[in-house]
């Protein structure tokens, strides 16, 4: 099992994954990122027309790189710190001697 999948599994089991997602959603809403991305989607759809030839997948492919660059550094740093704290907890739990009683 890779470190990434172990962390992923741990965060799912402990409920930390949903806490991280909730934190991310709230921070992106607070900073106006969600509104910016929503507006970007509307503008792209208006440019491409409404003839239904532009798919959701195409919209996602076009918006995703731009949207990622708009995520504020403060939000990225906060999430990285949260993930580091989780990794530290995992490491500390792994280092604790097992109770042999």
Swiss-Prot record:
It is found in: Nucleus, Nucleoplasm; Cytoplasm. Pfam families: EnY2. GO terms for cellular component: cytoplasm; DUBm complex; nuclear periphery; nuclear pore; nucleoplasm; SAGA complex; transcription export complex 2. InterPro entries: TF_ENY2, TF_EnY2_sf. One of its GO terms (biological process) is positive regulation of transcription by RNA polymerase II. It comes from the Eukaryota. Disulfide bonds: none annotated. GO terms for molecular function: C2H2 zinc finger domain binding; chromatin insulator sequence binding; TFIID-class transcription factor complex binding; transcription coactivator activity. Its main location: nucleus. Involved in mRNA export coupled transcription activation by association with both the AMEX and the SAGA complexes. The SAGA complex is a multiprotein complex that activates transcription by remodeling chromatin and mediating histone acetylation and deubiquitination. Within the SAGA complex, participates in a subcomplex that specifically deubiquitinates histone H2B. The SAGA complex is recruited to specific gene promoters by activators, where it is required for transcription. Required for nuclear receptor-mediated transactivation. Component of the nuclear pore complex (NPC)-associated AMEX complex (anchoring and mRNA export complex), composed of at least e(y)2 and xmas-2. Component of the SAGA transcription coactivator-HAT complexes, at least composed of Ada2b, e(y)2, Pcaf/Gcn5, Taf10 and Nipped-A/Trrap. Within the SAGA complex, e(y)2, Sgf11, and not/nonstop form an additional subcomplex of SAGA called the DUB module (deubiquitination module). Component of the THO complex, composed of at least e(y)2, HPR1, THO2, THOC5, THOC6 and THOC7. Interacts with e(y)1. Interacts with su(Hw) (via zinc fingers). This is Enhancer of yellow 2 transcription factor. It comes from Drosophila simulans. The gene is e(y)2.
């Amino acid at each position: 099992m890779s470190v990434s999948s172990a962390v992923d599994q741990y965060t799912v089991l402990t409920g930390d994954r949903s806490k991280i997602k909730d934190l991310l959603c709230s921070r992106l809403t607070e900073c106006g990122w969600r509104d910016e991305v929503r507006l970007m989607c509307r503008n792209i759809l208006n440019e491409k027309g409404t003839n239904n030839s532009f798919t959701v997948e195409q919209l996602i492919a076009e918006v995703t790189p731009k949207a990622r660059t708009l995520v504020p550094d403060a939000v990225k740093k906060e999430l990285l710190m949260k993930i580091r704290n989780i990794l530290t907890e995992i490491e500390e739990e792994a280092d604790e001697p097992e109770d042999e009683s």
